[in-house]
From Swiss-Prot:
The gene is psbZ. PANTHER family: PHOTOSYSTEM II REACTION CENTER PROTEIN Z (PTHR34971:SF2). GO terms for biological process: photosynthesis; photosystem II stabilization. This is Photosystem II reaction center protein Z. InterPro entries: PSII_PsbZ (IPR002644), PSII_PsbZ_sf (IPR036512).
Length: 62
């Protein structure tokens, strides 16, 4: 259980870093929002899912 929690936490941190770097790059690219909105929404959905995936087990582990 602890290993799965640590992996989910690492995935959350990695996804957060990718979104912090990737979203401004997506907005600054020539196509802008219209070409990259699916990628941004997919990343945001993954991030929200990981927040719940980390938050729920954290209440049992801590």
């Amino acid at each position: 259980m602890t290993t799965a929690f640590q992996f989910a936490l690492f995935a959350l941190i990695a996804t957060s870093f990718l979104l912090v770097v990737g979203v401004p790059v997506a907005f600054a690219s020539p196509g802008g929002w219209s070409d990259n909105k699916n990628i941004v929404f997919s990343g945001a959905s993954l991030w929200i899912g990981l927040v719940f995936l980390v938050g729920i087990p954290n209440s049992f582990i801590s």
